[in-house]
A protein has these predicted regions:
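Aromatic-residue detector
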Residues: 20, 31, 80, 104-105
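Conserved alpha/beta enzyme-core scaffold
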Residues: 18, 66-68
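Surface-exposed, charge/polar-rich loops and edge strands
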Residues: 37, 52, 57, 61-66, ...
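Short glycine-rich anion-binding loops that position phosphate/pyrophosphate groups of nucleotides
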Residues: 1, 71-75
């Protein structure tokens, strides 16, 4: 997965509310408002970087943009995660009209059908690579 820290900082500096997930038992997540001084450490529920401290946010009821970590994505938006289902469960709760963006390297965008899919998998609308944003045919 590409490093999105610079983009997070740029969005924050522009006044955009940036939130990062914290893993909870049962493959659930809460969200914490991100700022440049927020401490990040490997989580205790899932072995991924997540916020230490910070208050959980009430998420908006209007559509939002969600950047999803991914190991791969195909041309129609099928996303391969790490298999925990955290993001798939969360995406089910998003307001209609929300946009899903898979953060991947350019060589992790595959032709249609080359990424394994399950019925519950979240499908991305865009792939965000270091080379730019690419619309997917979801």
């Amino acid at each position: 997965e590409p490093d999105v820290a610079l983009a997070m900082r740029s969005l924050h500096d522009a006044g955009v509310r940036v939130a990062v997930p914290r893993s909870l038992p049962g493959s659930r997540m809460s969200w914490v408002r991100w700022h440049p001084d927020l401490d990040i450490a490997i989580g205790t529920v899932a072995p991924v970087p997540e916020p230490v401290g910070g208050e959980d946010l009430e998420l908006p009821t209007h559509p939002m943009v969600l950047v999803l970590p991914a190991l791969a994505v195909d041309a129609v938006g099928v996303r391969l995660g790490q298999g925990g289902g955290f993001y798939d469960r969360f995406v089910e709760t998003l307001p209609a009209g929300s946009v899903l963006v898979a953060a991947v390297f350019e060589d992790e965008v595959y032709p249609t059908g080359e990424v394994p899919a399950e019925p519950w998998d979240a499908v991305a609308d865009y792939a965000w690579t270091p080379q730019g944003l690419r619309a997917l045919d979801s």
